């Protein structure tokens, strides 16, 4: 799904730890990864993306957003512990309202989106070393 020429939606959301992220107030680029707890590629990629971002772009906000109604905050908390990624990076999109702004039709997981201000920097379905190299250049 191409984002070329589109303006990213504005939104705010709270992390599992209650920290509020407001896209209107963020001046730096930020990265969103849409996932759900029973998604095999997400389980593999979330620790990889977290480690990559912590190492290469520690000041760029990284949000792991779960839009699936059946995934409770407790499920996501356990998921974060299992993957050894701090829960402060995880967000529950309780009504799917944020995710719907990013996906026209059907959601696909994982989807990784990079945004700066009013422009998309990238949008990938899944990541590998080549894509991580590309993200490093784009942020």
Region roles according to the model:
Residues 1-23:
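N-terminal "domain-start" segment that seeds a small globular fold
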Residues 55, 109-139:
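Thiol-/selenol-based redox modules, centered on thioredoxin-like
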Residues 7, 28, 107-109:
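Short, small/polar residue-rich loop motifs at catalytic or cofactor-binding pockets
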Residues 21-43, 49:
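Short active-site neighborhood of thiol/selenol oxidoreductases, capturing the structured segment around
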Residues 80-111:
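Short, internal strand/loop/helix patches
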């Amino acid at each position: 799904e191409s984002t070329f020429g589109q303006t990213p939606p504005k939104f705010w959301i709270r992390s599992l730890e209650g920290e509020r992220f407001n896209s209107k107030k963020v001046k730096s680029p930020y990265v969103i990864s849409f996932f759900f707890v029973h998604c095999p590629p997400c389980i593999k990629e979330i620790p990889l993306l977290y480690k990559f971002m912590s190492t290469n772009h520690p000041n760029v906000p990284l949000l792991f957003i779960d839009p699936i109604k059946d995934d409770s905050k407790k499920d996501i908390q356990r998921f974060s512990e299992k993957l050894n990624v701090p829960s402060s990076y995880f967000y529950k999109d309780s009504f799917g309202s944020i995710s719907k702004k990013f996906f026209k039709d059907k959601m696909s997981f994982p989807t990784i989106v990079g945004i700066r201000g009013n422009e998309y920097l990238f949008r990938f379905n899944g990541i590998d070393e080549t894509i991580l190299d590309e993200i490093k250049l784009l942020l």
